[in-house]
Amino acid sequence: MEQFDALLAQTIDSTLGLRCTLFGYQYSEILRSLMCVYLCGGSCVEDISTHLMKHLSLHPTLRTCSADTILRAIEELTCKNNTYKSASGKSYDFNTADKMNCLLIKALLATGQLKSGQKYDFDFDHQFIETEKYDAKPTYKKFFYDMNNGFGWNRLPKSFMAQNTVFLLMTALIRNFYKAIMQRLKTREFGLRATSRIKTFVFQVHLCSCKMD
């Protein structure tokens, strides 16, 4: 939790803006609270209020917000859909979520996963070009398996895709932070590898804690 604040809190709040001045939770605290759901073995946003709050609230300095606050923040950060009308007359809605996508990139720079001064291509193209080659199924299937089972993508919290887009980007940021921490951690001491999935991480850390007790 402290590493999250040290590496990302300033970046999050400067990009998304201050959510409150006197009372309430900043967006960095809300994202950290959501991160705790998955680093503690939870599977959905509601787990933080149902199972984790009584433990996380014992931290002497860092505050943890409720599931309702996380869900309100998702609504606050939701952007309107853009509608594109094709030449055939069909309309398509898409959501750019510019601020959250910008945060995702800035967070990667803050953790050192992207390097300042380097060139990166973030362009996304919907054009489909038919080829005779197979797609990289192991790559994207592994990613979706990881996000579905480790970071809540199989239990989206909202009914509308615009709101769920914010959640998907929030958890993508958390996943990137987890990857950054695993690169810094002495993983062998916990029976882990830098590429270990988050569920394996949670199990091994709890196992080591039991052995210490």
Identify what each model region corresponds to.
Residues 27-34, 45, 166, 170, ...:
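Short runs of predominantly hydrophobic/aromatic residues within well-ordered alpha helices
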Residues 177-213:
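A short, flexible helix-boundary coil/loop motif
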Residues 48, 137-161, 166, 170, ...:
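Short amphipathic alpha-helical "interface-anchor" segments enriched in bulky aromatics
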Residues 6, 41-46, 176-187:
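Short helix-capping/linker segments at secondary-structure and domain boundaries
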Residues 118-122, 149, 164-171, 201-203, ...:
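Structural beta-strand/beta-sheet cores of well-ordered domains, especially the beta-sheet scaffolds
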Residues 1-139, 208-213:
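Dynamic "connector" segments at or just before major functional cores
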Residues 20-23, 38, 60, 137, ...:
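Hydrophobic alpha-helical scaffolding
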Residues 54-58, 153, 183:
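General structural signal for alpha-helix termini and helix-helix connectors
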